[in-house]
Amino acid sequence: MQAQILALLKRLCKERGTSIILITHDMGVIAETADRVGVLYSGRLAEIGLTFEVLSNPMHPYTQGLIAATPRIEPETLDKKLYQIPGTMPNLSEIPDGCPFHKRCPKTTPKCFEVKPPLLYDRASCWLLENKTGVI
């Protein structure tokens, strides 16, 4: 049923030349329906880009965690436990200073606790990208 509804939405958007905003944690739905994706954490943009680029090369640790937590159907993965992003979501009325994901992030740096990262390379809000060079 879900596939039928999503196919209908895609067809209507194409016929009418419109767009749709889907809000979901279902990475499969995103992969099948979205041209572009924005990943939010605590109401703030963590990563944005073309769906293929974000799903094949996630740059923000939260996006990486979401993708790692997606069930797979490959035989070699069926007996493996799904990845869980550590910790819990912060209270949205008490978002910490710095990166909102820093308390759950496995890759934090001292700067993550102090300053909210800007969107770097027009792609992800993460201090880990600050010193990277080249084209993404």
Predicted regions span which residues?
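Charged, flexible cofactor/metal-binding loops and thiol motifs
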Residues: L50-I136
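P-loop NTP-binding/switch modules centered on Walker-like glycine-rich loops
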Residues: M1-L78
